[in-house]
Amino acid sequence: MKEWIIIMTAANRAGILAAVTRAMHDLKGDLRESSQTVVRGFFTMIFSADFPETLGQEVIRDHLQDVCRPFSIDLAVRDPQTHLPVYAAGVQDTRAFRLRVGGRNEPGFLQVLSQLMARLDIDITGMHAVRTAENGEFEMILKLALPSSVIPDHLLHEIETVGRNFGTTAELRPAS
């Protein structure tokens, strides 16, 4: 079996996931990991799956596109071996943390926060953010891979410092 990463997006409609899983079953694919969400009416999914070695990238892509044609899915198939050595090196000796941040919805906070994470070599492995309509605020939850060199209390202090101008509150906890 060979692992492939598949990324897809389409306007959300009932039945998309059923079509995707049917196509995978047709090709004898075995799901390893997936993440799926709907954002403002658009379905998006990324997953890792093993397929028989005899199936090439084009065969997998073409079959998924054919089965999912009624949904007008945009899709890409990637070989993780091209990128995994770099990724694996980047997450060695890291600890999983969950960061919750909220505050006034003003432009610039995510940029400042992501620049801080990049400077400290912290990988953001997951993120969900939403604007709350009732009072012009935002809520965000991030999954972080902290290098062993980062002290969580110091990171929280830096987040609170850069977020002060945006009226943010932050909570950082080890991921369970």
Describe each region flagged by the PLM.
Residues 1-176:
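A conserved regulatory-domain signal marking ACT and ACT-like small-molecule sensing domains
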